[in-house]
Amino acid sequence: PKPSSAASDVYKRQLTTQRVYTEAELRSRYEIMLENYCKTVCIEAQTMSDMARKQILPAVAHYAADVARDASGKQALDPDIRCGYEAKLVKKLTAVAESIDTRVDALDGAIARFKTLSDVTEGANFIRDEMLSRMTELRVAADEAETLTAESAWPFPTYGDLLFSVK
């Protein structure tokens, strides 16, 4: 991110002409804001990774195991009982868990690469070009997992709870 648009040039010229800030002060403020942005997004990415690894993946795996046990229990009672729904659900849950795991690995890799960057502008560009897309990919997979997992097994309030249970 570089403050090079026509509007930012106008603001920069106005602020320096009016002697509100010097050119060096504007650059310093810009770098401080970029650094704050980078730190904030990095904290969000690390939190997202931790939530997926420590809460979402275990919840999905546990729920898939419960569904598989339920299907096995039904078939133990009567071998003629078809458990197509349960089998399909377990396959979907397993696939989405694998997807989440892969995306967490990709996000962790992006976080590690970000931490090697020393220039704040390079870091902000990396966040824009790499880290945010990894976070979005993980979010999409986690949202899919939420739709497949029973509400009682999901470790967080659902969107419905957040939107409609305001008291």
Regions inferred by a protein language model and the residue ranges of each:
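Long, contiguous hydrophobic alpha-helical segments, chiefly transmembrane helices and signal peptides
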Residues: 8, 15, 26, 30, ...
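Preference for long, well-ordered alpha-helical segments
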Residues: 137, 144-145, 153-166
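Alpha-helical rod/repeat scaffolding segments in eukaryotic adaptors/tethers
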Residues: 38-49, 53, 70-97, 110-132, ...
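Charged, amphipathic alpha-helical oligomerization/scaffolding segments
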Residues: 32, 51, 55-62, 66, ...
